[in-house]
Amino acid sequence: MSSVEQITGKKILVTGVTGWVAGPLAESLAAQGNTVYGAARFKDPDQRQPWHDKGVQTVSIDLAKGNLDEVPADLDLVLHFAVAKSNNFEEAFASNAHGSADLMEVAAARSDKLSFFHCSSTAVYEPKHGEARKETDLLGDSHRPMPGMPTYSISKIAGEVLVKHTAKRLGVPTVIARLNVPYGDAYGWMSFHLMMMERNIPVPVHVDQPTTYTPIHADDINRSIPYLLSYANTGAEIVNWGGDQLVSIEDWCEEMGRLTG
């Protein structure tokens, strides 16, 4: 990875801040001397204080309903991680596609210096086992068979289309990063699979093993943001986003079994 200066002294909105990926990132950016706003629905007011304690201000937004009144003015950067997982396509499109474009529109109307980072997913690719994906590869509906995610791939594709269109129309420098498998010290597929193993629940794998991914740790997610932003342009550059090692579900389950007995 090229050397890129860390982000500091900026006014930043991080959406989906209550999620696994965006939360640690918002906390890290606040610690680097940025003014950080963490956005989520925050239906429970008590959810806000822990973020304030970490130096992250909170704003309430609802992408599906178009509730964006609290989006701050004069932002330098939006890091858009909010995502909805729904069995209903209309609900998924409202949040992941229309909501993403609306967010850019509102933020850009309130700032003349905005850059936009849109977190997409490698779930947008056509199902093709065992082959590395390039950003130009065919798109598809790979996550439809997964429990609770029948609309995920298609709505994330729709989100990319609308974000790309809106960036070009408004002239907002944008990068679309297709995230592979994120994990941290206390979250991610590995933790989930360990809990399944402890309960003797079979871990699903591809019929043609090994089931490989390129996992990326929270620390590397945080460190890679400035580099990815260097690709932002009004054409909304698309980049794959993962770790630099191929690792399979079979491998990490075997290793966790060895470590835990």
List the model feature ranges, each with a label.
Residues P45, S60-H98:
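NAD(P)H-binding glycine-rich loop region in Rossmannoid oxidoreductase-like domains
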Residues V4, I12-Q32:
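N-terminal Rossmann NAD(P)H-binding glycine-rich loop of SDR-like oxidoreductase domains
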Residues A101-T151:
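Conserved Rossmann-fold NAD(P)-dependent oxidoreductase catalytic core, especially the SDR/UDP-sugar
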Residues R199, S224-G261:
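Mid/C-terminal beta-alpha module of Rossmann-like enzyme folds, strongest
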Residues G130-E131, V161-Y213, A218, N222, ...:
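NAD(P)-dependent short-chain dehydrogenase/reductase
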Residues A39-D44:
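N-terminal Rossmann-fold cofactor-binding loop
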Residues A84-K85, T122-H129, N180-Y183:
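Active-site segment of SDR-like NAD(P)-dependent oxidoreductases
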Residues S155:
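Active-site helix of classical SDR
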